[in-house]
């Protein structure tokens, strides 16, 4: 239901509990000639930022994420790196477009193999007939556990892992960087558009970080402008 307030007051907001429900609701707004829909997400609800749902995103971070500037910058920079993962080739996008379940490998002869993986938590992978995996497509989440399992196997040396979008990547920076250093690559079927990064230097416990230092350090780390919206008022 959509409503307009007749007077000042307090409201209790609720909304769709899934991305599918959210997309349906957004489509229903066409009849109201709505030009802009703003989705309120969180770092713990990254799926809302999927390019399948939103056209672009603003990354809001701050002292609530970490009260240490160095740690906060490192964590945020990694999130930005994931958002900016390269789009995979058009050939791969066409090849995997209609696959919605499982994990699939493409060998050096461009033949596809169903690895019979039912979950990203599984360590049982069917590698029969595969000498080297050129491309690995994951329809679900890419987790630390799965990455730990495959990166030690020669068949996955210098493999490109393709996921639907950045919200499907649940890797720690250490594992991600180790995979890339080994010649691996992670790319996406749908690329997100990051249009701004904002910070709130005030933590929930009242601790306040140096806003100027935070914005400057983070901007240098991610090579993007960073805004403290409170100072922009």
Regions picked out by a protein language model, each given a short descriptive name:
Residues 1-233:
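Flexible phosphate-sensing "switch/lid" loops adjacent to ATP/NTP-binding sites
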């Amino acid at each position: 239901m959509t409503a307009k307030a007749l007077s000042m007051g307090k409201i209790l907001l609720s909304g769709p509990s899934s991305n599918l429900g959210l997309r349906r609701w957004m489509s229903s707004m066409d009849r109201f000639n709505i030009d802009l829909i703003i989705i309120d997400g969180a770092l713990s609800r990254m799926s809302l930022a999927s390019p399948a749902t939103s056209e672009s995103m603003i990354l809001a971070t701050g002292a609530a994420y970490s009260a240490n500037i160095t740690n906060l910058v490192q964590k945020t920079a990694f999130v930005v790196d994931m958002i900016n993962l390269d789009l995979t080739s058009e050939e791969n996008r066409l090849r995997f477009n209609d696959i919605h379940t499982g994990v699939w490998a493409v060998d050096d002869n461009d033949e596809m193999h169903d690895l019979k993986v039912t979950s990203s938590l599984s360590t049982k992978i069917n590698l029969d007939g595969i000498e080297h995996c050129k491309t690995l497509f994951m329809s679900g989440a890419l987790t630390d556990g799965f990455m730990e399992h495959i990166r030690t196997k020669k068949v996955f040396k210098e493999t490109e892992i393709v996921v639907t979008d950045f919200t499907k990547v649940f890797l720690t920076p250490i594992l991600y960087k180790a995979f890339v250093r080994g010649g691996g690559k992670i790319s996406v079927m749908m690329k997100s558009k990051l249009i701004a990064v904002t910070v709130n230097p005030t933590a929930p416990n009242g601790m306040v970080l140096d806003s100027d230092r935070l914005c400057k350090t983070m901007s240098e780390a991610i090579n993007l402008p960073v805004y403290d919206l409170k100072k922009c008022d």
